Amino acid sequence: MARRPARESGGPIEPTKTNREKIIEAMMELLAEERVEDIGFGAIARRAGLTLADCRAEFRSVVAVVAAYTKEIDRQVLAGGDTDTAEEPPRERLFDVLMRRLEALARHKAAIRSLARSARRDPALAVALNGLTVRSMQWMLTAADIGAAGPKGMLRGQGLALLYASVLRTWLDDDDPGLARTMAALDRGLARGARWAGLLDELCRFVPSRCCPPGRSSRRPRDAAEEEPAAA
């Protein structure tokens, strides 16, 4: 039977956690200390107190661990939805959703900063992270009750991913507990996103087959459309 290596420093990982959760936590701890390109499964296994076989059973690559972390953040944000915001305008709902996301990320801020720096140096990593972010942003749009399905939803997701990346840069340098700079950047970004969404709606009027399913109008009734100024 393979021995499980002793866990390296970084604070104890709760024994009740699954191997998958231990690996994700170990990855984020290591990311706070070094570049993602320097992190391998050997280091992750040692930090998590697991074997390489345990790691291989859960993940195929280091980027897959990052993807699993992103998915877990999505889950936390979606689980923490506030029904009191249901009557708010879409832009306000999306603002609340994205601020919940940043709150969920706060514990691993140093790791996120490290990952962002690596992405600026590595185009392939940047492309992979963009794909993860677009998928996450489609879930965030859905959480805000803003359409995120189909080609139009993909465009909204990509637009929101770009906006989110910009806000994330502000957040990484915002040491104010109240996150005043971050909230201001997000508010400005969502205002720009609403204008961009209006242009997207106009485009879909002329290219309905690409933006809307066959047999359905490319534009919602006027009164309904005005209630959904999508952010991206």
Predicted regions and their residues:
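Helix-turn-helix
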Residues: K22, L30-A68
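Hydrophobic alpha-helical connector segments
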Residues: G81-S114, R121, G131
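Alpha-helical DNA-contacting segments of helix-turn-helix folds
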Residues: L31, V63-I73, V77-G81, L115, ...
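Short, hydrophobic secondary-structure boundary micro-motifs
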Residues: G40, R113-L115, A128, A149, ...
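Amphipathic alpha-helical interaction segments
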Residues: K22, A43, D96, S114, ...
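Amphipathic alpha-helical packing segments from all-alpha helical-bundle domains
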Residues: P123-I146, M154-S166, A184
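Basic, helix-initiating cap at the start of DNA-binding domains
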Residues: M1-E34, A43
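C-terminal peripheral helix-coil segments that are non-catalytic and often amphipathic
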Residues: A2-P5, D173-A232
